[in-house]
Amino acid sequence: MSRFAEVIVVARDAEEVMEPLTRPDADREWHQCFTRVDDSVFAGTGTGSAECYLWVIQFTRHNWRGLLAHLEALPWPDPRSVQVLVHDEEDDCFGLWMIYDGRLTEVPLPHTVRRLHPDVSVTGTLSRTDRG
């Protein structure tokens, strides 16, 4: 099934934890790799600092079911800084997941509702309730 989904991971001091996810790994449930986004993108300098807080990935197939559980299980140096933003093809906006009590948990966003559709989407669809 062809379907687009974008995932952004924001986390402090997580370069070592995220680095393996920037390389192909046949043992993972998904095959795409995260791309590191360092501060050179924002500064326009072409060279970034050693610290990176942001990684992005786009899925073009419905093949990333294990991603959120995998991210939850990583040994994050600062779990309170971890934010995972997910935008599925049918979503009105990005959904936000954060680690609470060791679990990657969706944070309810104002004026949104998530409808689960396991046969269509990994996370369901996130719709704005304030649309006209």
Short names for language-model regions:
Residues 1-29:
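Short, extreme N-terminal segment that most often corresponds to the first beta-strand
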Residues 14, 26-28, 39-40, 71, ...:
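Short linear motifs in intrinsically disordered/low-complexity regions
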Residues 19-46:
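An N-terminal amphipathic alpha-helical segment
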Residues 43-132:
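Charged interaction segments
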